[in-house]
Amino acid sequence: MTTDVRRGIIAVVTVLVLVALGAGIGVAAGDALGIRVEESDRMHPAEPAIARVEASVPTPSFTDIDAPDGPRFEAAIDELTDATADAASDAEQVALTVTAGAEEDEHDDAYNLAVDGVRIRIDAPTEAGAVRGVYDLAAQIRAGRAPEDLAGAHGAARLPFRMVDIGAVGVTPDPEEWRPGTNYSHISEAFRDVYLDEEPYIDDTALDDAFEDWEEFLRTSVAQGYNAVAWPGFIEYVDFARAPGGPVYPDGDPHIARAAALREAFAPFWDRASELGVDVFLRTDMLALTPALDDYFTKRFGGADTENPELWQVYADALDELYADQPALDGVVIRIGEAGDIYDTPGWDYYSALAVRSVDAVRTMLDVLTAGAEASDTEVVFRTWSVGIGDVGDMHIDPESYEAVLGDIDSDALIVSTKYTAGDFYSWLPLNETLAMGEHRRIVEFQSRREFEAFGSFPNDLGPELQWALGELLAQNSNIEGIWTWTQDGGPWRAGPMSLYLKSGFWQLYEHNTRQAAALARDPDADLAQVTADWAREWFSDDPATVAAIAQAMARSRSAIENGLYLAPFAESRVSALGLEPPPQMWLFEWDILTGDSATLDVLYAIIGPHRVQEAIQGGRVALAAAERMRADIEETDAATWRDPQLRDAFLETLDYEIDTLGMLGAYREMFLALGEWHDTGSPEAYERWQHARDDYLARAAAHVDAYAGDVDHPAWNLTAAQLGIDRADRDLVVAWAARILLVLALAWLVIGMLSARTRLVRRPGAAAARAAWIASTRPWRARESTLGMLALDRWLLVVIPGGLLVATRALQTSLLSWTHLAIVFGAWLLFLLVVRVCVGIRSPYPVIAAVGGVVVLRCIVTLFALAFTGPGGYWFAFWTEPFARVVYIAIAFALFVWAFVAAGWAMSMQVGGRRATGFVLAGVGAALAITAFAVAVVGLERALTVWNDEMGLLPWGMARILGITTFLEIPASTPWWAAGAGLVVLAVGALLALPWRRRTDSASR
């Protein structure tokens, strides 16, 4: 066997191994993407009913009220007095007697109401029942119904625990903070005006204003039927005085004085809630930290060791101290699934970290904290919201994970809180089956102001869905004892409309859902049609026709939401990707960002499929028609019948906003689905449809921005990501043609090189360079001989052709929009070649240039072939949606990439030997990796990835603005530093191998 044959066999085997490795990487990439689709069983609520609306009965006047003393009765009687404030001067004079038994069971709020002529009597075994009777009587009068219709026995509420957030208490409605619409922080900044940076730490005037907010919120919530509240905060109220081995905060540390000031300031808030029969639960993420506490954990436990019970005892002791100091506090609500910068309060060093990530950590936390709660007669509400975090990432939706984490934890002080949807608060999701299991006390989470459905700025009647869900869950799990309704919270506070509960904007729209949730908690079979009519009568009109029209509009609202904000053929599926379950609303990335990235839109099209594209498009039209009918319902009402003309205007304006938005979204869905079809089929008709839909969308988007930019009540949606996607798509066809032309030229260069090796064509100008590149790239051991005797032109072409082709190919691959990508790629290649050139020294550099350049041409041909179909959009479409094509492409691309370095080393080995040639290559690779990674590290990995992704449009644009790409993909921020370090190691090894070694000779004579 000749040397050339042996080398050829080695080369073939090497290439086959590289292709196999590349195929393995391709398969691994597919597994990492983890895109799987299965059927999803969505909820099946009844169709909304419309109550028969009768004329209101005259409002009575209560001239004599005999009720027990106490804050709860005072507040209830104030509500009744307010409900009868519009009674006519000649209204019927009514007397009310209220009696309450001595029982102290807060769960028993049963009562009996009797009417005897002009005398009404409420009797109840408990104070809670008697107070409820007064509130129900007030609601009956507000609804325009006769007190006689309320007569009879009313049993205790089905669910005794009914909690709310704190609404918008302490939040200042400043339009200038909402107008930009780009602040995606989840911090409400409640009580911001109350806090001072220095002693006394509290602004008393602002505190008084906040207390007025609190009083109104408490009275409203109690009147609706709620009896618990989740108050944000914990770590700012404690000083960890009992921490073993402490102190956490040394004497004189401002954290100690600030905690005392905050406790003193907010104690009256908590006490007032207790006076009105409302339990107060502190609400915190875990781990809740300060720099000092983090240092304490590091010194004592070596870090935040969340599986160590002693760490959790530090928190338990702090809670015990707080409960002893503030007896109005009843427990704590804990979340472990979200944290990070968007949850941290500006100006404070209190923050939270995603550190509770294992089963043992969760169980240890709950064991310690519930033991403390049992001893202090308080409760721990544990939210199962874990959203992909660590080993407990799917605990919130997966029964097996739920059982593994919580299965045998047994404590009467533990309440487990879970969202009713199998995921976040989206439509189309199945019921959360983890709520049907377990022996723990359970509460169900609802959200009134649906953050993913336009932040409550569109009418959105959730009542039938909540009723169906609660009915199903109660039938399956008798341990469910309550609900938690989010009246305002959830999502970013200042990236949507400035609708603040009881304060600003059209908050009455989502207050409707808060009422319905309370009604269902008391009676899961409540007549929601009547609840809706009562809501409409209280806020908008006493006219039966107007009330009926409003109820009809609300009944249509879900069709507009479910079809307009979702793509039904996709939303009805359950999708998994990257180990998570993307929401059914992927094309709207978190709240108001219309996404334009290829990963999302291409996968959406692939799951919908070409056979259901028209169905998905039709859904947008159905939604738009529903919104237009809703507007007609309201428009046809008599303006004179409305209590407040401004509320009628608000209703019409919000429907105009919804119609405008849904029309824009309908055009966008048609646009990107047509584009996906073109990438999928190459159909000219699909491309033409995309062009028409694009023009329609652009016109609607411009009109939308013109109409709503700067409108804090109806903010313009964030269309930046969508526009970036359009900018790229506009170039696809041009880039595809450019790629085809370059592909022909590259193939011509390749063919010339192949033919020149055996024909007289080699004598033509440039042919020798093509021949050298072909031979050196396929048989690098012949690189030196193939470059001998070349003319200056051929030597230039050896550099210019591969280099120019690489520049052009990579530029086309990025649609000429990502200079960051080009800088990284070209910078790395130039660094590699520069180091190799220095290493080669006085020897001819053309063998290695020919070898690397020839492989670069082959690698560019592969990319140009992929781009030649429908441009970069088609390239990425195939990557995201075609597993076989993805594996084949990665296998070939990887093999050629590595072969470039193998060929470089092999070519130089003919000049300096195998060891030194290997050192040259490693030194070049190490230098390129180290310097490129160092540059990324200096810029910051998150910032670099954000800029790169903005230009390439591969992942959701909003990801970087909200959680961060590194956080979402769990990429450590230190990664580029480690890569730079690895590059230095490779460089050092390469330099060592590259040095000329001389054997020692023994010069001693023997």
Region roles according to the model:
Residues 36, 42, 178-180, 184-185, ...:
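C-terminal non-catalytic alpha-helical accessory regions
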